[in-house]
Design a protein with these regions (language model features):
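Conserved acidic donor-binding segment of nucleotide-sugar-dependent glycosyltransferases
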Residues: 285, 312-313, 317-325, 333-338
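A short, well-ordered alpha-helix in the C-terminal region of glycosyltransferases
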Residues: 333, 340-355
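A short, active-site helix/loop in glycosyltransferases that binds the activated sugar's phosphate group
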Residues: 104-105, 122-124, 130, 134-162, ...
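Nucleotide-sugar-dependent
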Residues: 202, 248-290, 300-308
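N-terminal strand-loop element at the rim of the active site
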Residues: 7-14, 26-76, 147, 161-162, ...
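N-terminal subdomain of nucleotide-sugar transferases
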Residues: 1-46, 89, 209-214, 218, ...
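Conserved donor-binding/catalytic core segment of Leloir-type glycosyltransferases
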Residues: 4-6, 141, 170, 174, ...
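Nucleotide-activated donor-binding/catalytic signature segment of Leloir-type glycosyltransferases, i.e.
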Residues: 189, 223, 229-261, 271
Length: 386
């Protein structure tokens, strides 16, 4: 099937949405589909986007600039994307997270709209509602059951929507191609890892409190924009905390084996870059699945949305995000219990390989949709609705 993937953000970038988009295009290509990605030009200096993200396939990427960072600019770019789609070989399916691009191209082919939050910023108001009512809408993909329920409620006037729930995913680790990075700190103490952005609501303050309470452990935080790293480093001052800053996604797998325990201390309100959105109710964090793919023992926040994937005492330990005593006890106990670490990590990896790979997700989100000449995509890994 010929798939046009429409992304309103930039490639390459240091944002998580770029990782998600590139992984999905890679997985669609691995499944035998002919994929072209339409994106905005890169906002991060990387000569080779494929190498930067560590994807296995070199699908075409067409960069379409945003003339100005306003709704009018987004619409002008969307019309340019539509012109390119109309001039190229017609796609069998348009897929994406860009409501402007999908709305502009809705008459060209059936389309799938993937949602990661309920957006309040699409202009003019009603654009998304009209998109969801279009006769060529084939499916809505939501990353969590919580989001699917809220999204359906927000658009209840349209009646039942064709929503499929497909969580984020991770790839099984590839064989290492380079030596593991040499980490600062003490070589003979347990290493606690966090991988991800340093935005408000990600629990960085909780990590620093744990580091203060447990001076016998070293804490390594991988990721974060320069300004966020500087803000947290400036308020830290602990000798057992190390901020490593942003790393290309392709390099992250080399860090995971160094960590004895990994943390996902999300708070009840989780913010995106610049506090432009609050997504804690609906999150499906890619870092959790990457932790799982590497078989690392996880301590995560006990939040309803995370319980869609995580099970306390089975594939992780869950603790309330606002109870640092419980986190400190759990971390100290897990560090001291090698058998429990192995059991949690092994089960997390088993579940990842069985349920949450990008290839499985690619098959699931396309299952049953019309393909070339009206054929249906195979239902090999069909997902349930919500």
């Amino acid at each position: 099937m010929r798939i046009a993937y429409l992304h309103g953000g930039t490639i390459p970038s240091f944002f998580a949405n770029g990782v998600h988009v590139m992984r999905m295009c890679d997985a669609f290509t691995a499944a035998g589909h002919d994929v072209t990605l339409y994106t905005a030009p890169g906002s991060y200096p990387a000569d080779d986007a494929y190498a930067y993200y560590g994807v296995r396939h070199r699908f075409p990427i067409r960069a379409v600039p945003i003339p100005e960072d306003t709704p009018a600019g987004y619409w002008r770019r969307a019309e340019r994307v539509r012109d390119l789609l109309a001039g190229d070989t017609a796609p069998d399916l348009v897929y994406g997270r860009d409501p402007y691009g999908l709305a502009a191209a809705a008459d060209l082919a059936p389309f799938v709209y993937e949602v990661h939050q309920i957006r309040r910023d699409v202009s003019p108001p009603g654009t998304e509602h009209r998109l969801l009512g279009h006769q060529r809408l084939a499916r809505v993909v939501a990353i969590t059951h919580a989001l699917a329920r809220d999204f359906q409620e927000a658009h209840a006037a349209l009646g039942p929507l064709p929503i499929l729930v497909a969580p984020d995913c991770a790839d099984p680790p590839a064989p290492p191609t380079a030596a593991a990075p040499t980490l600062p700190g003490r070589p003979d103490v347990p290493r606690i890892g966090y991988v991800g952005h340093l935005y408000d609501g990600r629990g960085i303050d909780l990590i620093l409190e744990l580091a203060d309470r447990l001076p016998g452990l070293d804490f390594h935080l991988i990721g974060g924009a320069a300004e966020d790293r500087a803000r947290w480093e400036g308020s830290c001052g602990l000798p057992n905390v190390f901020f490593h800053g942003h790393r290309p996604p392709a390099e992250l797998p080399s860090y995971y084996p160094s960590f004895d325990v990994v943390l996902a201390p999300y708070q009840r309100k989780v913010y995106t870059w610049g506090r432009l959105g609050e997504t804690g109710r609906w999150a499906s964090p890619m870092k959790l699945f990457e932790y799982m793919s590497h078989g690392r023992p996880i301590i995560a926040s006990d939040l309803p949305v995370l319980r869609e994937v995580l099970q306390d005492g089975v594939n992780c330990l869950l603790r309330p995000p606002d109870e640092p005593d419980a986190w400190a006890d759990a971390l100290a106990g897990l560090v001291a219990n090698g058998a429990l670490r192995r059991a949690l990590g092994d089960e997390a990896r088993r579940q990842l390989l069985d349920r949450y790979t990008w290839r499985r997700r690619a098959d699931r989100v396309l299952a049953g949709l019309p393909g070339p000449r009206g054929e249906s995509s195979p239902n090999k890994h069909a997902a349930n609705g919500f």
